[in-house]
Curated annotation (Swiss-Prot):
Keyword Ligase belongs to the record: no
Gene behind this protein: his-2
Gene3D superfamilies, sorted: Histone, subunit A
UniProt record similarity statement: Belongs to the histone H3 family.
Name of the protein in question: Histone H3
InterPro entries in the record: Histone-fold, Histone_H2A/H2B/H3, Histone_H3/CENP-A
Region called Disordered, residue ranges: 1-43
Source organism (scientific name): Caenorhabditis elegans
Superkingdom of origin organism: Eukaryota
Length: 136
């Protein structure tokens, strides 16, 4: 079929087709041209709740062994030089430390909730320790 020149005709009052905004047109054409898909992100708090459930289920130690052992040796240097530790002694210290910290954070969370907050703050830790009688 041969192309013919179109002539202008008078409108009959129907709605005129809208012009698309430049941004909308660009947005539609970008993925078609092999655009990079942005990575999936979870809503704030979702990953935190998943981690809470995961760590509450688990029983493994959460502090790495080597850094904890270095800390123990550094503290022990103040009392006596050239101290030697059995590996089971360091493990027992680590178990006790982690149990203490977990309990302290539980009490700290209760202090934050009591203050009608969900974020723990240093003042919550101080209050928890004061109530426990560890610090005046």
């Amino acid at each position: 079929m041969a192309r013919t020149k179109q002539t202008a005709r008078k409108s009959t009052g129907g709605k005129a087709p809208r012009k698309q905004l430049a941004t909308k047109a660009a947005r539609k054409s970008a993925p078609a041209s092999g655009g990079v898909k942005k990575p999936h992100r979870y809503r704030p708090g979702t990953v935190a709740l998943r981690e809470i459930r995961r760590y509450q289920k688990s029983t493994e130690l959460l502090i790495r062994r080597a850094p904890f052992q270095r800390l123990v040796r550094e503290i022990a240097q103040d009392f006596k030089t050239d101290l030697r530790f059995q590996s089971s002694a360091v493990m027992a210290l680590q178990e006790a430390c982690e149990a203490y910290l977990v309990g302290l954070f539980e009490d700290t969370n209760l202090c934050a909730i009591h203050a009608k907050r969900v974020t723990i703050m240093p003042k919550d830790i101080q209050l928890a320790r004061r109530i426990r009688g560890e610090r005046a």
